[in-house]
Amino acid sequence: MSSKEKLPSSRIAAAGPSQQPKIMTTIVRRALITGSTSGIGRAIAEALAARGAHVLIAGRNTQRGEQVVAAIRSARGQAQFVSADLSSARSVAELATQSDKLLGGVDILVNNAGIFSFGPTAETNEDAFQSMYAVNVRAPYFLTAKLAPGMANRQWGRIVNITTMVAYLGMPGAALYGSSKAALQLLTQAWAAEFGPNGVTVNAVAPGPIRTPGTEGMGEALEQLGKTVPAGRVGTPAEVAAAVAFLVSEEAAYVNGATVSVDGGRAAV
């Protein structure tokens, strides 16, 4: 779709008790979700599409990306896929440009893509440090830098950063990963102050232990981690997506600079 083509608009009735809350009322909101070919990102993309958004799936795996698009379209949603490797600064800039062209503007940005690894600080090498911060901090920083001004000009925008419970909880072996996400959490607050006066809200969602393809390698350790939270279990991507769906909705217009913990209560204890 070219930048000159207009996205279809449709009037959606106000949600009743049995209906899902809608992201928009009379126009289609356009959403970019990074790292959305699987796991939490895919669940977010599907949730926003189900609520009426036109979603742009971004990730490295084309096959998985097209599968997500097909699933959303089969449910009568609007979706497209764009290949992006957020470890590259050039690719980040290209993604911002492509998103604007494909969607005709981005109203909702979900900075979900991230990488993680755990280990002693003394065993962390510089390459691992640079890689972690490139994806977890640099990519969302410059995507926001490119896309938030357009939202501000239109006087409406939603940015949600996906962080983690270890961004605010000290955990052995999580210094590198936790610090990168803590940086994103601070950026959430700074951007809320910067862009809030122009109708753009910026919030974070901090998941706890969530079962995804990316955490499968943790094996029994994930289950044990789930038992440490008050809920006593591991969470699901859909539970994280539900929090994101609220934060990007019209109803959340007065929620800005907040971090919503989806961690089974771990932040409380």
Model-identified regions with their sequence ranges:
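Residue(s) in the substrate-gating loop at a strand-loop-helix junction
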Residues: 164
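C-terminal substrate-recognition "lid" of short-chain dehydrogenase/reductases
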Residues: 103, 141, 156, 233-262, ...
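Alpha-helical segment proximal to the catalytic Tyr-Lys
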Residues: 149, 192-194, 253
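Short, small/polar-rich loop/turn modules that mediate ligand/substrate recognition or access, typified
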Residues: 196, 201, 255-257
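Active-site helix of classical SDR
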Residues: 144, 180, 188
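Conserved glycine-rich cofactor-binding loop
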Residues: 37-38, 61
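Substrate-binding pocket helix/loop in short-chain dehydrogenase/reductase
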Residues: 120-121, 128-133, 159, 225
